[in-house]
Each structure stands twice: as structure tokens, then as C-alpha cells.
Amino acid sequence: WGYGKFGSQNESNNLAEDLEIVTGCLREDFKLRPEEDGARIIGNLTFEERNRRGEWMSINCRDDVGDSGYGVPYNVESEKLRLVSHDIDFMMAIETGGMFDRLVENGFDENARCGLIHLKGQPARSTRRIMKRMNEEWGLPIVVFTDCDPWSFRIFASIAYGAIKTAHISEYLATPSAVYLGIDSDDIQAYDLPADELTSRDIEALKAEKSDPRFQSQEWMDQIDLMLELGQKAEQQSLAKYGLDFVTDTYLPEKLRQKLGIVIG
């Protein structure tokens, strides 16, 4: 037989996907651990996580963690992680670490009665799964706060509708009721945000999204068309043009009121 080594990472990834499809089980059931990190969570939520000795540990994501938050494990199914209680009104998923840290520093989780979850860019499976569970089991709305570029749009799409690579388990990972909060193309104009020119790769990605089934709503078509018309993209950090507290004092309260009817304060 010789050595059973994989020639590349893609070989093992494809095998894991095939196993999931053939068996109807998740890769976590096979103890296959991804290299990707899970999210960080801050907020008044309490979980119970089973430790290596098989004992349940109670963890409050506000009182029992430091500023970096609770690290989401690779397996967040009920046999490893229990959702115990919460005293929040919604979960906000945040793309960048800098913005997550800013919201934590400003105490936005307590002021807005929300949980904050750092996506670390394209979210890991465990990140999407725990958001799905909190939405279904606790009835918490999921709102997504990202940069304004085609790649960030795809981050939202992977949360709300699922990713191509994990299409076979979208029912476990996707949260169709998730709401895209911003930054969107309208904000570049409305808030006169510092912006960068779209690259040829950005433009190609936006044109591809116009035929992507996940972006066929009129709202998404309008956003994509406006970005192409402006020829610009913007980062979350562009909101710092108006000071470090602008995002928590003005921008997010305005967007939450507009899109979800949530009034802060």
C-alpha cells in the first residue's frame, strides 16, 4: 500500500466534503479539525462547553473573558456546546479585527444590548454554525457589518445563503434572515467616506455577482450597480474620518434604526 499521504491540502479537503455527502455526517463528527480559527465573541451570553475531561464548563462571554472575547471552538454542536442563556437583543457579526476591537473598547455590546462576533474575514464553519444556532434556538437577529467591496458582499452571502464549497450542508450553516447592515455603496456618498478606486479584479468580481443567485434581489442589484458606477470601495475604518466614536455614537445607531427598527439608548 505504501504511505497514505495526501499530495496537497485540496485532496484532504475534497475527501472531507465527499465523506459528508456520502455519510450525511459533518466533518466534526469525524474529528477533522480545520486549520482556520473560529470567531471571537463578546457579550452577555452564557454557554456551557464540554472540556477535555468531559465536564461542562459555564462561560459568560462578557464576565468570564478578557478583551479578546470567547474563542469559538471548531465543534459547536450540542454535544460539545450548549446555549444556556442570554440578555441581548441581537448579534452583530463584524468583518475586521480593528472594528471589533473598537466596538468592544467603546462598550457597544452593553450600550446596544448586543453580542459582537469577529468574523476574521471569510467566516469559519464553526462561526457560521454558532450564528445559525443562536438565530434558531434563541431567536436572535443576525446583522452583518463589513467593508464595502465585492469580497465583503460575499462574506455576507456565505452567512445568509451559504458558500459554494459547503452547499451540501447549507441547512446547517446558513442564516437566511441575516441582515446586511453596511458599509454599502450608498454610505460612501451619504457620509462622504474616504474611498479607494476599484481594481480590475474588483470589477470582475462585481460583474460575476450580478449573475450569482445569492445577489438577485433588487436591493443587491442596486448596490452592485452603484458601486460599479462610483468605481469606489470603502473600508470600515473609513468611518474614523469623523472620529473614533462616530461608528458607535452615530453610524451604527442610524443603520440599526433604518434597517431593523432598533433604537439604541
Where are these regions (language model features)?
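Glycine-rich phosphate-binding loop
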Residues: 147
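Nucleic-acid enzyme cleavage-core boundary/entry regions
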Residues: 1-141, 150-265
